[in-house]
Amino acid sequence: RKNTTIKDSDILSDSKFFNAKDMIATTIPAINIALSGKINGGFVPGLTIWAGPSKHFKTSFSLLMAKAYMDKYQDAVMLFYDSEFGTPQSYFDSFGIDTSRVLHTPITDVEQLKFDIMHQFEEIKRGDHVIVVIDSVGNLASKKEVEDALKQNSAADMTRAKQLKSLFRMVTPHLNLKDIPLIVVNHTYQTQEMYSKAVVSGGTGIYYSADNIFILGRQQEKDGKDVTGYNFIINVEKSRFVKEKSKIPIEVSWDEGISKWSGLLDMALESGHVIKPKVGWFQKVDMETGEIGEKSYRMNDTYSFSFWHPILQCPKFNEFIEKKYAASNGAIMQEEDEVAAVYEMEDE
């Protein structure tokens, strides 16, 4: 260690970069599950991507995370890089975000974003509470593309993916060294296969750098013929904490926004904490005794703190959620005696 020229070098077991990081919980249990595989989990510093087509609530999920971070740290500030200008101040107000703690930076090309964000990161010290949101990189042009347009040059731009890869390659070390959460809104496109699938735009650089990539799908929520909101599905494309390809439902209504209790009913039905004795009715189950509660609930009656609090506090429900969604952190290599037993069986 004495010969290294890097000041932050340390014995691995003592390194501050491998200590447990603060986890920031959001107010929506299902979002916490998507981020960490735990009801009472949340997100840690690193790169999170919310990707999907237009009007898929990508910015809202990003601001929900930013709000949780700024509530946890009263001295926290947000750097908001804006290329789409579709997020007015009223949007921040609806999430209860103090806009006096938000630095709004308009951007027009990838290089402009890269230069400014790196300048900001060079000035940020470990221990500073800063969260960064980029909305978005999906339609952000490269500098060459802009210059070609001004010159009326219609040649294809081959630099954009390289510049995006360069951007995320440069910022990723800072996120981990300085404990900075970076939340990026991005677009998706459909592959041209027979059974097409959604792919995050921007090339491989985003995939390599991201800790979490969520691809959003949706379907309409109707009351009769009127559309009252959307049912979103968070598809876990990549995660360091959650099993990939997991699907977490989230409900959003025009009147009440994101439902705090989104997705929990399906999970509780699967775990056995709630049963559906007949169409449109639900009952809770005491998992210690196996007894079914006397009270029956309509769907709308399940959207309440009193209904969910006992279930969310139940260790068995938490264990079910973690087993279903959390990525395993068990030993990668087999124990020596297990390996020896395998060889002995082969020799017989």
Region annotations inferred by a language model:
Residues 92-93, 144-147, 194-196:
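Short acidic, glycine/serine/threonine-rich loops at helix termini
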